[in-house]
């Protein structure tokens, strides 16, 4: 589950005496409910009519502590290194994922915590050590979301974009990356040799106290195959308005891919929740947000999504740019 903005936190506080949401044990085994925290400005609504706010630690702490209070299972932060611009400067202002989640790990006690690694920016040995550190802070409640990187300007601005051939090789890169992580988390040592990484008696200690959970967001065939082999969970996107099962074909593809590897890989589905006292009030709020859609920022996202011409039509970013997805608007 994905919160849309800080107003959702206020809605949760206002509604607190009336919330009686529980899951039976057998339901909890089948379903996990989490919050995708607003690490970037304005959360998840690309609209001039939505609340405009900056990301802060205090904001994210309040949301994650409230989620933990109501027995949510996990909190996850993305990573974004350059935003979409527009009138709202959407995601032009962002916190950093690992340091944010380390702080949140220290002020929570039960909820699972996930940070996102932009793998082009961080060597796997550094991610392995940071993850082990947050595992220690959290008491074994930490996991890592691995992203290959799709938004070229994020990396060009730092001089580290490897060239457009990377679009077709990014899961080869990520495969080597996760193999190094597995070595270091599992044995504390890696001598991995590959096309992208060369480890020479690389050491990480202490190791995580529990097996490290890995999330990916593969939507392409290559992404699904990677998740089937290496991930514990794979993200997919909810679509439409009040169509909660529209993601089912994507989840079915993931299940089929996992059957080929003999692994159990769950699907995490991203939904944007627009909440109010009644369905009609929520619909009115949604229409108000939609009327203020930041077309400039949305156009920039669509333009960037078309830069990758080598990974197929079902990539993660193209799902994001789909106007029926959880992070955009139905035009």
UniProtKB/Swiss-Prot annotation:
UniProt-annotated stretches for the region Disordered: 300-331
EC number: 1.14.99.46
GO function term, MF aspect, one: uracil oxygenase activity
UniProt KW keywords: Flavoprotein, FMN, Monooxygenase, NADP, Oxidoreductase
Binding site residues for FMN: 79-80, 145, 154, 170-171, 220
Keyword hit for Repeat: no
Biased composition (Polar residues): 312-331
InterPro entries (UniProt xref): Luciferase-like_dom, Luciferase-like_sf, Pyrimidine_monooxygenase_RutA, SsuD_RutA_monooxygenase
Keyword check for NADP: yes
Domain of life: Bacteria
Pfam family, one: Bac_luciferase
SUPFAM superfamilies reported for this sequence: Bacterial luciferase-like
Induction remark: Up-regulated by the nitrogen regulatory protein C (NtrC also called GlnG) and repressed by RutR.
Any one GO BP annotation for this protein: uracil catabolic process
Enzyme class: oxidoreductase
Catalytic activity: uracil + FMNH2 + NADH + O2 = (Z)-3-ureidoacrylate + FMN + NAD(+) + H2O + H(+); thymine + FMNH2 + NADH + O2 = (Z)-2-methylureidoacrylate + FMN + NAD(+) + H2O + H(+)
Family recorded in the similarity comment: Belongs to the NtaA/SnaA/DszA monooxygenase family. RutA subfamily.
Function summary: The FMN-N(5)-oxide reacts spontaneously with NADH to produce FMN. Requires the flavin reductase RutF to regenerate FMN in vivo.
Protein name (record): Pyrimidine monooxygenase RutA
Lineage of producing organism: Bacteria, Pseudomonadati, Pseudomonadota, Gammaproteobacteria, Enterobacterales
């Amino acid at each position: 589950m994905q919160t849309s903005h800080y107003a959702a936190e206020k809605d949760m506080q206002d509604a607190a005496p009336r919330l009686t949401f529980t899951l039976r044990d057998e339901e909890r085994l089948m379903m996990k409910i989490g919050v995708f925290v607003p690490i970037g400005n304005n959360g998840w609504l690309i609209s001039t009519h939505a609340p405009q706010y900056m990301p802060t630690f205090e904001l994210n702490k309040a949301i994650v502590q409230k989620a933990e209070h109501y027995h949510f299972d996990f909190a996850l932060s993305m990573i974004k290194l350059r935003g979409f611009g527009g009138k709202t400067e959407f995601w032009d202002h962002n916190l950093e994922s690992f340091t944010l989640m380390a702080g949140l790990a220290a002020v929570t006690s039960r909820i699972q915590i996930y940070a996102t690694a932009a793998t082009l920016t961080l060597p796997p040995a550094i991610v392995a050590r940071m993850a082990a550190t947050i595992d220690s802070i959290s008491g074994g409640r930490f996991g890592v979301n691995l992203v290959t990187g799709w938004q070229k300007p994020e990396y060009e601005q730092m001089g580290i974009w490897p060239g457009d051939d990377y679009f077709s090789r990014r899961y080869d890169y990520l495969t080597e990356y996760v193999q190094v992580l597995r070595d270091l988390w599992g044995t504390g040592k890696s001598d991995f040799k590959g096309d992208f990484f060369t480890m020479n008696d690389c050491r990480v200690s202490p190791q995580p106290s529990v097996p490290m959970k890995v999330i990916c967001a593969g939507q392409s065939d290559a992404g699904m195959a990677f998740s089937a082999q290496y991930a514990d969970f794979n993200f997919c996107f909810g679509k439409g308005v009040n169509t909660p099962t529209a993601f089912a074909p994507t989840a079915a593809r993931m299940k089929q891919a996992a059957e080929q590897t003999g692994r159990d890989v769950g699907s995490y589905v991203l939904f944007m929740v627009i909440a109010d006292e009644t369905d009609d009030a929520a619909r009115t709020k949604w229409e108000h947000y939609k009327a203020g859609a930041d077309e400039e920022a949305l156009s920039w996202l669509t333009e960037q999504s078309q830069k990758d011409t080598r990974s197929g039509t079902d990539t993660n970013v193209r799902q994001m740019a789909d106007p029926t997805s959880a992070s955009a608007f139905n035009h």
